[in-house]
Design a protein with these regions (language model features):
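Juxtamembrane helix-capping/reentrant segments at transmembrane boundaries
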Residues: 1-2, 56-68
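Alpha-helical transmembrane segments
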Residues: 9-41, 70-121, 126-127, 149-256
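Alpha-helical transmembrane segments within multi-pass membrane transporters and channels
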Residues: 39-50
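Short clusters of hydrophobic/aromatic residues that line enzyme substrate/ligand-binding pockets
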Residues: 51, 59, 123
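Short helix/strand-bridging catalytic loops that position acidic/His residues to coordinate divalent metals
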Residues: 54-57, 205-206
Length: 256
């Protein structure tokens, strides 16, 4: 008799502060809003069929996979082609670029190159903590193959991880509690990666304008903590697929 579809509360609690407080022209915010609406609709359709149509199977698995795959393609195309998704790399003193940034802090001069499109991904244990997809396909000599490889990995990650919160949603408070911790950690990484001083000091890729996502993740953490009050044992409401699918994609979208 415990009500479900409580994830709608989480979505509203995230969307309203984001729309009111964030720069809606920021491409990272746009991607997260698209992800939120898209997975929210898939989760809502699944819960609606289960609750109101008395069909325990919910939305057919093939439609879920199709929706997640389409979302992965949209996110991949935006990330690959949008001019605002760039990085700035730290330079040595003997390296010079036309539009370099020189940042001086306590006589410690740091040089950053011009904004550049890149398929580099931060991964620990790799050289310089980065994996460059272009090096996997011949140093950028085969851009189509590089894009297809990047697209495959993005789509695979989205379809594989999007249901991860479902695995923890069966125990009271577990999904929201874990998600709040993950969200807070990712919010810190967004701020650090969007700040050239901290990014350079901690050897993290500097991504301009990424720190705008701190507002989004703060809303997400607040929504999870607030929902946890009613979802902890004994649970008064469950988030349902509309919540669990969206939560998974919140975390996954930030990681991508």
């Amino acid at each position: 008799g415990t009500p479900t579809m409580g994830g709608i509360i989480i979505l509203i609690s995230v969307l309203i502060p984001t729309i009111l407080l964030c720069d809606l022209t920021n491409i990272y915010i746009i991607i997260m809003l698209i992800t939120t609406f898209w997975m929210g609709l898939i989760g809502f359709a699944d819960d609606y069929i289960k609750v109101f149509k008395n069909n325990k199977k919910g939305l057919a698995g093939r439609f879920k996979i199709l929706g997640q795959t389409l979302l992965g393609i949209i996110v991949c195309v935006l990330m690959y082609n949008h001019d605002d998704i760039v990085i700035r790399e730290n330079l040595q003193k003997n390296q010079k670029f036309e539009n370099e940034i020189i940042y001086n802090l306590n006589d410690n001069t740091q040089y950053f190159g011009d904004s550049q499109k890149s398929l580099k991904t931060t991964i620990p244990f790799f050289k310089n903590n980065q994996l460059d997809y272009e090096t996997l396909t011949g140093d950028g000599q085969k851009p189509l193959i590089t894009f297809l490889l990047f697209a495959f990995i993005v789509v695979f990650i989205i379809t594989a991880v999007s249901n991860s919160a479902n695995l923890t949603d069966g125990i009271d408070g577990l999904a929201t509690g874990c998600s709040a911790i993950i969200g807070a950690t990712l919010g810190i990484f967004c701020y650090v990666s969007g700040n050239m001083v901290f990014a350079n000091y901690l050897d993290i890729m500097f991504i301009p304008n990424l720190s705008e996502l701190v507002v989004f993740m703060s809303s997400f953490v607040g929504a999870c903590v607030g929902f946890l009050w009613y979802n902890s044992y004994p649970a008064q409401v469950f988030m349902g697929d509309v919540g669990s699918l969206s939560i998974s994609l919140f975390e996954l979208g930030i990681n991508l």
